[in-house]
Amino acid sequence: MNAMLIVAIVIAIIGTIPVIIRKKLLKNYLTLLQNNDIKAIKDLMATQLAKICIPPFSREYLLLNAYLKLKDDKQIDTQVNNIMDHVPMNSKQKSALAKSVFYIYVDKKNASMIDRLLEMVSTTNDHALYRQMDMVNDTLISGGIKYYDELKSDLEDVEYTKNNEDTPYLEFLLSIIYKNMGNESKSKEYKNKALEDSKGTVYESLIKSQN
């Protein structure tokens, strides 16, 4: 057999080994996650096999996901800070981290963590996510009216609202902006719209939790 072909086959075989091991590790992780066995998950992610086959961000993110499932606020905070302080991330990974925990900190009104996440996302190319986070932060946390003109204009556009699944949440944000402006009647009008339009959508529980 041609020597180069042999080398290519060996390289291909070696290359598949980490993939096979990674699949087995992830299968074990899912089983442990289903059983809420955090200690075993931590031990699994700390093994040499996991360190070799699973990239650093993925290992830490899987551990964070376990804490999120258990709603362990203290460990969530510790793990988020650990990832942000010590784990190199690309733009996609930064966005994934922010999406996972941002609304948790909004619910807690944890301004310092929200600011950290905003600063992190500002260094990515995910401008839509940054705008969304900044809009929520300014409206719900800072009590601002920065996005008043933009939201009012968007929600007055019938075609825009009809084809936009985010409409209920935008209505909710505008209701809060009116409240921040001291316009209680308009605030109530848009709050009722948001509650009605969010029924049966992913935003229903989110709006009620932040209401």
Task: Describe the function of each predicted region.
Residues 17-27, 52-61, 90-99, 125-137, ...:
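Generic helix N-cap/helix-start motif at coil->alpha-helix transitions
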Residues 35, 70, 107-108, 142-145, ...:
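Structural motif corresponding to the intra-repeat A-B loop/turn of tetratricopeptide repeats
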Residues 40-48, 73-86, 110-125, 146-162, ...:
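Alpha-helical repeat scaffolds
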Residues 138-211:
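Extracytoplasmic/periplasmic C-terminal soluble domains
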Residues 32, 67, 101, 105, ...:
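Residue at a conserved register position within TPR or TPR-like alpha-solenoid repeats
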